[in-house]
């Protein structure tokens, strides 16, 4: 390099230590300034160029119009290029004229000139790629200015020293160059205008990050405006920025889906290759081990999806880790500087500045790393939620039965969140070993081979912690199973809460949940104890390493002296070593939890999907809309086929009826046409779009209009036609908001008939080619059914000309169909036109002979008129066929099955859909819909975010839940461990000063022993505090869950009608998870960072009292940042919590309606809807992540200032301080940055997580029902004895502010009397039963049973003495015994007797498990009739004096109806029976009939008298053919 600089007047050496270091006026040689210093910016730009160009090529952000700013920057670049060339030409000029300039004067202008040309071109290329602020060029210009400052000073000092300017030309060009690069730096700090054609331009509220300048992005200053806004007022949804394109769900999910698809393809190829025959020998085949089927790896799919983010974060993390080792080296030099009185003072100031600069750079890069990794974590969670949602849309029905909604919601809420939680620790897998290796390397440099002793400690402790983590994983797996069971049970309880209240069964289910919860908490406790042991091991590890290393060092050789430099540089290295070791427990815990979640998610994603090719859409015979050729179908591969060898051809435009007995496969046939069943063989072809009306009407939680439109654009004419033909116009007049009325979850505020008609209107509006109608007429009365058939389905209806497949029970419409398919035993037994089937004289004709007279008379007469010849033919045929007699077993059985299936049309009102929902919706009509508002028709209340500070009462509640003594003990233990840590370090400082004061170290054993004792004391106190926290946290988790559970079980029915179950489940899943597993570690980390911060300030002030001067300003700045941050982050967290519930509510709703969604081809629309809800959640999550980074940069700046001032004051007071105190002070200062950051973070996290307590407490304090038992007013033993029921001037409303639904009702029912209750929909029939059980409380008046006012006794004393057979026969998952007798009060003989009387004993006896037969969720594995008989058995077991039948037989077949009515007449002969009836024939022999009309008693007399009077009841009886 010296030759490069030449010799002579302008020549110099490249480096001169006396000039640059060992002097009080340091400078660099001209050669160094003109060469390496000038080249540094150029080297940087050329090094960064390849990666930057690659980035720009793959990130087109738009096009920026040429602006004055761009022109100025370009002009400056050109001028700098010119200045460099002028310098170069001047050197050539000198060479020509014989002055022989040094080579550096040719090389440097050439290098700088080319680099300036590159910078100029880069300015324009960035403009074309839409870059508003270039970080690469800002750093380049900054380096140019920094590297030019030294020559700037040197040239002036040289000119002053020499009295003249040695090289006036280069002197002038340099200052021109300096002025230009300084201007370029200033201009580059200003950002360009937004680019054209950018998506950001269309955004009304874009995230400012996208257009922020380089320094703003580096320091997260762009977040400041939102922080100020959040400080001034609570943030709202409208304040949140839109998501950038790359963060949106549709982008992120698609990337993961593509990666997952590749994994599936690879796995399938691997299996195919394994399965290929290679013609081996017989022995080889027999002896060869069976190859394991290779499953696609979800982990690999995740890694491939987020590779770029992982690599970017790894780069940031690597730089940050390397920078972490700079300050210990600077500390070493600083201590040596303090020890050397002859060292120049500027060394100390330079060291202080370098320590500040190093810390600041580390801060900036650290938070770029965190931002990168947390944004990746957010995208990861979004992608996993999206993939789970998409999978749920296509899983088979058998998988749906295995994976309940609660379990799938857990995958989304808990398991996806765990991946997000563990993501920030992923890089520890490689960075922790790197940091440990580097720390040990530097320790070796200081302490020599003694450092290996510390390595040995680490190596020995790793297996111990590994064993602990494996045990933790075992507990984690078990705990998640209990969590799933608890959530599943809670989901069932919430969906069947009304049944539990009516039967007074809440205590039984309460105990079930508490039992599961107890098991879950036991595993949590064990896991937490193991976590505490793991924490103890790793907290003690750095200290043990320090102790043993220093002990070995001083004992291995007497000449080894522990001085301040060795002690505190080692200590700072050990503190660095402590970070990865302390994080390892969290990493292990997080990875353990994530591995469990990974397996759960992977297992779910590998479940079977419906075959999209099951139904062919193109190849079909001409003239036909639907064909099935040799079709055999099953619901699951491991189950026998449900439908066998079907051969069906349905012409275009035909109306086809499907009839048959119970379980024959009618609904299965519709499902097979939809592709919902698994096809074993055959071909199914469907040509055209499909509309589907299921047995169980699926209604969304949105407005009635949105339910009908179902995502299609509004066509007013078609919409009006759909409402009119489906008889919905009259309902719109009653609904508070008309068609804008919000329909509650699962259509809870509509009657069964209204739900079915909305479902039918959706189909009509869809204007599809093919309509699959699964029994849509069973849920409406006879007149409405006739209207719908005539106006919609029939030959003259709006669907005339469309292909219609109608599953039906009634026979009055069959003559108008084009042909009929009769199913029996999963096969087509007969098929043909109505008249042809009559001529065939099979089971269909036999059924008509027996049950046609029971049909509605008017409808039957119409049928006779329309098919007179067919009926005459029927009479003739039946009279001549003697082989169809009842003594033929096969024929009799078919007839019996038909009898079970066919139901007479209802006489009035609307009945519930014949197939009960899987989840309990609401069996009782909602005449006055409980929570409607007249103005808006909104039912579900919006979840409101709390604002302002979290109330101190919430913290107090949690502290009390933990136990006040426990809370106080934890704080004292943490304070004690901090004191022990300070004591150990102060002792180390004194030990290191022994060598300074005495030249050697005496009392080494004492020094080492005390140091060891203090360290061990610290470790023990940490472990004690962790164990104490476990005790308190588990107790708090138990009490808070218990309070929530008890309150919700006791909440009134109106609460469940107005609150989505997803919102309640969110409390039991996500919020309880936070209380269980997140809150306690957060508190421990807060205490740790708080005491560390306090102890650091105390040590620094004690070491350098001058530091007191800056403590107050830094504390003010710290408090200022903290107040801004906490206010904003708290509200962002609340908004995130509020926006999370709709994701799960929508998911639950989607899973129950997948068949409808698929049938209408709306899968893509629902994906978009789910993505929208997830994106809305991300809109609050992303600013929350940014707020943490904003906090980190600003707080760590305060911490860096602490480092700066600690070092500066050490330099200033070097004459009065010993090296030990300086080492102690600065080493503590180096820790304070992280401690201050974590303290605010943990304060905020505590506030964010304590919101879970707030939300749980909120739902633990909602209004409850009356007490279950009033000890001071218990009902007499054996009450009621007679069963006399009186309503005295009774009025009721659903809630304050609404109209009365029953008005001044006065009714007296004698004991043992049988009373039927009838009336049109909305008359108040079911309201009476709600009042009798006190589901609704009186507005005025009273109900008296056997002389006792029911309002004066406990709810369970009342409800347990009444019996109801509800319209919806709800069963719960569990044994049949539990569903009959949840309290275990009855003997096995009693239960079998009840089963015998309810005609279920044959079925139960045939089951291998008998009474322990496992009922599926909702009783899904039993038929509707069987479920209703179970309800009858419940009533027989209870055998109370008052029995209520709430339309109990409206949705079941005739035979089951006959069985129930016969049993009721015999077994409840002496009981009071109140029957809400739709089938008037069931109450014609009752003592009296109560007719309600608009909430008042219209008629009340015997059936005979009421018919004779010719009033409302007479009209109903006439409609039913009974008068």
Curated annotation (Swiss-Prot):
Glycans are attached at residues 18, 1002. Pfam families: ABC_membrane, ABC_tran, TMD0_ABC. The modification Phosphoserine is found at residues 903, 906. Residues 1-35, 97-102, 151-170, 325-345, 441, 557-567, 989-1013, 1093-1096, 1213-1219 are extracellular. GO terms for cellular component: basolateral plasma membrane; ciliary basal body; plasma membrane. ATP 2 binds at residues 1319-1326. The chain crosses the membrane at residues 36-56, 76-96, 103-123, 130-150, 171-191, 302-324, 346-366, 420-440, 442-462, 536-556, 568-588, 968-988, 1014-1034, 1072-1092, 1097-1117, 1192-1212, 1220-1240. The keyword Protease does not apply. InterPro entries: AAA+_ATPase (IPR003593), ABC1_TM_dom (IPR011527), ABC1_TM_sf (IPR036640), ABC_transporter-like_ATP-bd (IPR003439), ABC_transporter-like_CS (IPR017871), ABC_transporter_C-like (IPR050173), MRP (IPR005292), P-loop_NTPase (IPR027417). It is a multi-pass membrane protein. Its EC number is 7.6.2.-, 7.6.2.2, 7.6.2.3. It is an enzyme of class 7 (translocase). Keywords: ATP-binding, Cell membrane, Glycoprotein, Lipid transport, Membrane, Nucleotide-binding, Phosphoprotein, Repeat, Translocase, Transmembrane, Transmembrane helix, Transport. ATP 1 binds at residues 660-667. It catalyses: an S-substituted glutathione(in) + ATP + H2O = an S-substituted glutathione(out) + ADP + phosphate + H(+); ATP + H2O + xenobioticSide 1 = ADP + phosphate + xenobioticSide 2; 17beta-estradiol 17-O-(beta-D-glucuronate)(in) + ATP + H2O = 17beta-estradiol 17-O-(beta-D-glucuronate)(out) + ADP + phosphate + H(+); dehydroepiandrosterone 3-sulfate(in) + ATP + H2O = dehydroepiandrosterone 3-sulfate(out) + ADP + phosphate + H(+). Detected throughout the gastrointestinal tract, liver, lung, pancreas, bladder, gall bladder and at low levels in the adrenal gland. The keyword Glycoprotein applies. Residues 903-915 have a biased composition (Polar residues). It is found in: Basolateral cell membrane; Basal cell membrane. GO terms for biological process: bile acid and bile salt transport; canalicular bile acid transport; leukotriene transport; xenobiotic transmembrane transport. Residues 626-850, 1287-1519 form the ABC transporter domain. Residues 57-75, 124-129, 192-301, 367-419, 463-535, 589-967, 1035-1071, 1118-1191, 1241-1523 are cytoplasmic. Gene3D superfamilies: ABC transporter type 1, transmembrane domain (1.20.1560.10), P-loop containing nucleotide triphosphate hydrolases (3.40.50.300). Belongs to the ABC transporter superfamily. ABCC family. Conjugate transporter (TC 3.A.1.208) subfamily. ATP-dependent transporter of the ATP-binding cassette (ABC) family that binds and hydrolyzes ATP to enable active transport of various substrates including many drugs, toxicants and endogenous compound across cell membranes. Transports glucuronide conjugates such as bilirubin diglucuronide, estradiol-17-beta-o-glucuronide and GSH conjugates such as leukotriene C4 (LTC4). Transports also various bile salts (taurocholate, glycocholate, taurochenodeoxycholate-3-sulfate, taurolithocholate- 3-sulfate). This is ATP-binding cassette sub-family C member 3. The gene is Abcc3.
């Amino acid at each position: 390099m010296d030759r490069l600089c030449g010799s002579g007047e302008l020549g110099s050496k490249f480096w001169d230590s006396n000039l640059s270091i060992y002097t009080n006026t340091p400078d660099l040689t001209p050669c160094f300034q003109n060469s390496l210093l000038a080249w540094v910016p150029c080297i940087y730009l050329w090094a960064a160029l390849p990666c930057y160009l690659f980035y720009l090529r793959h990130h087109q952000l738009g096009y920026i119009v040429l602006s004055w700013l761009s022109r100025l920057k370009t002009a400056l670049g050109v001028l700098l290029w010119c200045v460099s060339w002028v310098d170069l030409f001047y050197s050539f000029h000198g060479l020509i004229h014989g002055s022989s300039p040094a080579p550096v004067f040719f090389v440097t202008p050439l290098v700088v000139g080319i680099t300036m040309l590159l910078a100029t071109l880069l300015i324009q290329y960035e403009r074309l790629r839409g870059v508003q602020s270039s970080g690469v060029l800002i750093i380049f210009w900054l380096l140019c200015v920094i590297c030019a400052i030294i020559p700037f000073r040197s040239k002036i000092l040289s000119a002053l020293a020499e009295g003249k300017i040695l090289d006036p030309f280069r002197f002038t060009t340099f200052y021109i160059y300096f002025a230009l690069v300084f201007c370029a730096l200033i201009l580059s700090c200003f950002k360009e205008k937004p680019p054209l054609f950018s998506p950001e331009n269309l955004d009304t509220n874009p995230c400012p990050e996208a257009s922020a300048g380089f320094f703003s992005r580096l320091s997260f200053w762009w977040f400041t405006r939102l922080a100020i806004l959040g400080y001034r007022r609570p943030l709202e949804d409208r304040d949140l920025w839109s998501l950038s394109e790359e963060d949106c769900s549709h982008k992120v999910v698609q990337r993961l889906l593509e990666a997952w698809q590749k994994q599936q393809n690879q796995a399938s190829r691997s299996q195919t290759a394994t399965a290929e025959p290679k013609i081996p020998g017989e022995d080889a085949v027999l002896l060869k081990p069976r190859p394991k089927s290779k499953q696609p790896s979800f982990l690999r799919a995740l890694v491939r999806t987020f590779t770029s983010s992982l690599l970017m974060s790894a780069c940031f993390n690597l730089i940050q880790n390397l920078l972490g080792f700079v300050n210990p080296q600077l500390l070493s030099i600083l201590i040596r500087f303090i020890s050397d009185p002859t060292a120049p003072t500027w060394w100390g100031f330079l060291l202080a500045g370098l320590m500040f600069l190093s810390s600041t750079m580390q801060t900036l890069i650290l938070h770029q790393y965190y931002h990168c990794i947390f944004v990746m974590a957010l995208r990861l969670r979004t992608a996993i939620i999206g993939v789970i949602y998409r999978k749920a849309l296509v899983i088979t029905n058998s998988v749906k039965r295995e994976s309940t909604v609660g379990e799938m919601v857990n995958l989304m809420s808990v398991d996806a969140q765990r991946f997000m939680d563990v993501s920030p620790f992923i890089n520890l897998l490689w960075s922790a070993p790197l940091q440990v290796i580097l720390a040990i390397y530097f320790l070796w440099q200081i302490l020599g081979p003694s450092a290996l002793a510390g390595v040995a400690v680490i190596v020995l402790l790793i297996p111990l912690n590994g064993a602990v983590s494996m045990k933790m994983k075992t507990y984690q797996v078990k705990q998640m199973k209990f969590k799933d069971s608890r959530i599943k049970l809670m989901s069932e309880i919430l969906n069947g809460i009304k049944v539990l209240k009516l039967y007074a069964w809440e205590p039984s289910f309460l105990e079930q949940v508490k039992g599961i919860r107890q098991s879950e908490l036991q595993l949590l406790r064990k896991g937490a104890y193991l976590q505490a042991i793991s924490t103890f091991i790793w907290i003690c590890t750095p200290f043990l390493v320090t102790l043993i290393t220093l002990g070995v060092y001083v004992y291995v050789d007497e000449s080894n002296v522990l001085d301040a430099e060795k002690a505190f540089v080692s200590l700072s290295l050990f503190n660095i070593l402590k970070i990865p070791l302390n994080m390892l427990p969290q990493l292990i815990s997080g990875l353990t939890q994530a591995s469990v979640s990974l397996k759960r998610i992977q297992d779910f994603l590998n479940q079977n999907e419906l075959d999209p090719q099951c139904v062919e859409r193109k190849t079909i015979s001409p003239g036909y809309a639907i064909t099935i050729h040799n079709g055999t179908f099953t619901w699951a591969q491991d189950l026998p086929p449900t439908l066998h060898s079907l051969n069906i051809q349905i012409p275009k435009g035909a109306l086809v009826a499907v009839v048959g007995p119970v379980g024959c496969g009618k609904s299965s046939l519709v499902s097979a046409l939809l592709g919902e069943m698994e096809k074993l063989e055959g071909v199914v072809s469907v040509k055209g779009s499909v509309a589907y009306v299921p047995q169980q009407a699926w209604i969304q939680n949105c407005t009635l209009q949105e339910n009908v439109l179902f995502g299609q654009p509004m066509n007013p004419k078609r919409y009006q036609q759909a409402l009119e033909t489906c008889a919905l116009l009259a309902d719109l007049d009653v609904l508070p908001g008309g068609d804008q009325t919000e329909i509650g979850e699962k259509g809870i505020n509509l009657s069964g008939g209204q739900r079915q008609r909305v479902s039918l209107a959706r189909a009509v509006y869809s204007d599809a080619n093919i309509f699959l109608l699964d029994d849509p007429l069973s849920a409406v009365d006879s007149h409405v059914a006739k209207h719908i058939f005539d106006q919609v389905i029939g030959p003259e209806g709006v669907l005339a000309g469309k292909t219609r497949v109608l599953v039906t029970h009634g026979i009055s419409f069959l003559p108008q169909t084009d042909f009929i398919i009769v199913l029996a035993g999963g096969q087509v037994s007969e098929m043909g036109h109505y008249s042809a089937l009559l001529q065939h004289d099979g089971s269909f004709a036999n059924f008509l002979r027996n049950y046609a007279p029971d049909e509605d008379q008017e409808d039957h007469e119409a049928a006779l008129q329309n098919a007179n010849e067919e009926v005459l033919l029927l009479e003739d045929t039946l009279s001549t066929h003697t082989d169809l007699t009842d003594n033929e077993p096969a024929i009799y059985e078919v007839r019996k099955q038909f009898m079970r299936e066919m139901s007479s049309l209802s006489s009035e009102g609307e009945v519930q859909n014949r197939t009960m929902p899987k989840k309990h919706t609401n069996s009782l009509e909602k005449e006055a819909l409980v929570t409607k508002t007249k103005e808006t028709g909104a039912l579900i209340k919006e979840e409101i975010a709390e604002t302002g500070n979290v109330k101190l009462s919430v913290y107090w509640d949690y502290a009390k839940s933990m136990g006040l003594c426990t809370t106080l003990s934890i704080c004292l233990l943490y304070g004690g461990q901090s004191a022990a840590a300070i004591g150990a370090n102060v002792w180390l400082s004194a030990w290191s000063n022994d060598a300074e004061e005495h030249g050697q170290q005496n009392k080494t054993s004492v020094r080492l022993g005390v140091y060891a004792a203090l360290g061990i004391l610290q470790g023990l106190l940490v472990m004690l505090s962790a164990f104490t926290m476990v005790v308190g946290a588990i107790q708090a988790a138990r009490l808070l869950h218990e309070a929530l559970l008890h309150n919700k079980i006791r909440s009134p029915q109106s609460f469940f009608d107005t609150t989505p179950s997803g919102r309640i489940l969110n409390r039991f899943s996500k919020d309880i998870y936070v209380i269980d597993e997140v809150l306690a570690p957060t508190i421990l980390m807060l205490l740790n960072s708080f005491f560390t911060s306090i102890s650091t300030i105390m040590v620094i002030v004690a070491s350098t009292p001058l530091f007191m001067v800056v403590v107050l300003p830094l504390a003010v700045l710290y408090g200022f940042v903290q107040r801004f941050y906490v206010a904003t982050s708290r509200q962002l967290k609340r908004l995130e919590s509020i926006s999370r519930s709709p994701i799960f509510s929508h998911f639950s709703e989607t899973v129950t309606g997948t068949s409808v969604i698929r049938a209408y081809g709306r899968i893509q629309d629902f994906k978009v809807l789910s993505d929208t809800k997830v994106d809305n959640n991300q809109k609050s999550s992303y600013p929350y992540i940014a707020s943490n980074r904003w906090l980190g940069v600003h707080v760590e700046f305060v911490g860096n200032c602490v480092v700066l001032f600690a070092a500066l004051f050490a330099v200033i007071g070097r004459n009065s301080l010993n090296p030990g105190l300086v080492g102690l002070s600065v080493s503590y200062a180096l820790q304070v940055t992280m401690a201050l950051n974590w303290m605010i973070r943990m304060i905020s996290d505590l506030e964010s997580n304590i919101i879970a307590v707030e939300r749980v407490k909120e739902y633990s304090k909602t209004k409850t029902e009356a007490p279950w038992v009033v000890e001071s007013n218990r009902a007499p033993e054996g009450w009621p004895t007679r069963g006399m029921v009186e309503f005295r001037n009774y009025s009721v409303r659903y809630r304050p502010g609404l109209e009365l639904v029953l008005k001044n009702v006065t009714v007296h029912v004698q004991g043992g009397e049988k009373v039927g209750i009838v009336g049109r929909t909305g008359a108040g029939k079911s309201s009476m039963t709600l009042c009798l059980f006190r589901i609704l409380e009186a507005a005025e008046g009273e109900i008296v049973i056997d002389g006792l006012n029911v309002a004066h006794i406990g709810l369970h004393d009342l409800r347990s003495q009444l019996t109801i057979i509800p319209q919806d026969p709800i069963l719960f998952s569990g044994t049949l015994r539990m569903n009959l007798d949840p309290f275990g009060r009855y003997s096995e003989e009693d239960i079998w007797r009840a089963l015998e009387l309810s005609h279920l004993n044959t079925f139960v006896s045939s089951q291998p498990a008998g009474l322990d037969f496992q009922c599926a969720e909702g009783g899904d594995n039993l038929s509707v009739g069987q479920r209703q008989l179970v309800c009858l058995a419940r009533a027989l077991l209870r055998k109370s004096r008052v029995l209520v039948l709430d339309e109990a037989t409206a949705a079941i077949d005739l035979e089951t109806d006959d069985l129930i009515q016969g049993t009721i007449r015999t077994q409840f002969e002496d009981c009071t029976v109140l029957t809400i009836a739709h089938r008037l024939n069931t109450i014609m022999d009752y003592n009296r009939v109560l007719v309600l009309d608009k909430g008042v008693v219209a008629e009340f007399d015997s059936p005979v008298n009421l018919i004779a009077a010719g009033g409302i009841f007479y009209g109903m009886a006439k409609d039913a053919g009974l008068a």
